[in-house]
Amino acid sequence: MNLPTLWTWILPPIAGAIIGYFTNDVAIKMLFRPYKAIYIGKRPLPFTPGLIPRNQDRLAVRVSDTIMGSLLTPEELQKLAKRLLDTERVQGAILWLLQLALKQIKGDRQAKTAEILAAILHDLFGESLARLLKVLARRQDFLEKQINQIFDRLVLEFSLSEQQARQFSDWLLETVLPADVIRLALIDFLTDRNIQVIDEGFREKTSGTYWVVANLFGLRNALARLRTFCLDEKDLANTRIKELLLSLEMRNRLKNWLQSISLQNLPISTVRQLRKTTRDTVRIYIQESGEQFLQDFGQTIDWDQIANLIINRLQSSVSMTTSLGVISQELALILERYLEEDLEKLVAQIIPILNIDQVIRDRVNATSPADLENAIQGIVKQELQGIVNLGGILGLLVGLMQTIILIAQNPG
């Protein structure tokens, strides 16, 4: 067997294997090369640029349609949204936001935060709440339950303790009704006319032994002497009045009387009317003066100081820090219940807003042919190497078949 004949048999398998192995790489390069059109004069050469660069716009549309039609369908987007909006993930995100907000309050923005909070509080209590109360006060049942509850628990059940009654009676006898005030009241009361009226009434309405005393002696002289005594002997009169109050145990009597005062002793109809009067008085006052009262009251408050106190309290509050987890969990559960009902509608509304298909087209069109080629070559080398090897094997088999045919045709 001579060398040319041997080469005739060996060359087809080798050539077939080489061609089959490198066909994919050559085919890919032929799809992209050249990247730009080559001109002879003003006429471009045929098949320039490559197939993909020449039809890159149409390729972008096809890629976008394929992805949106097969991969990113509304159902898949819903599943993706459910995975992304898992309760634990949402809770973690909300907790992070709350902690970030708390850190912002603790940081350099405290003054700004306090200023904003002060403005909110001033508007809420000075303006918004005042207008709201004025509108609500027009209703006949405005604060009815609340006022009735306050009346029943505080006013109706109110009674003085023994110590309070003692202090109150001491205050009455020492400040409101001291001996000197009682003496002056007696002087003012015992005018000539009042003395005459008392004496005549005593004479006319008594009978028996008292009638004899009243008509023989009367009360005129006794009352006149009492008035003169109070006028002339001030200190002595005050001393006698104090002794009289002490002898009559007025302090204890007054204390016992104060302790016995209770609205529960009144008739039920009177209590009901008193409750209704209290409720109507409060409602009418709020209707007429409530708005102005709240506005004036709001002007007297240092809202900046209040805001700073609130922020400082939040900063040092352990319960505030520990409650962030509970708050984030509750908010996450609320969001989960909402998404269970309306996730399909939300996804249908979000897809046109995101405009994913146009984003895909823009990205494909913005990618240079060289980058596309490198990306496809990388995929082929990393993920489709088996196809490349298979091409080499098929080329080898085709070459062997050709060698067999040649041997069969030339047996000698």
UniProtKB/Swiss-Prot annotation:
It comes from the Bacteria. The keyword Amino-acid biosynthesis does not apply. One of its GO terms (cellular component) is plasma membrane. The chain crosses the membrane at residues 3-23, 387-407. It is a multi-pass membrane protein. The keyword Membrane applies. Keywords: Cell inner membrane, Cell membrane, Membrane, Transmembrane, Transmembrane helix. Disulfide bonds: none annotated. It is found in: Cell inner membrane. Belongs to the UPF0754 family. This is UPF0754 membrane protein MAE_37850. It comes from Microcystis aeruginosa (strain NIES-843 / IAM M-2473).
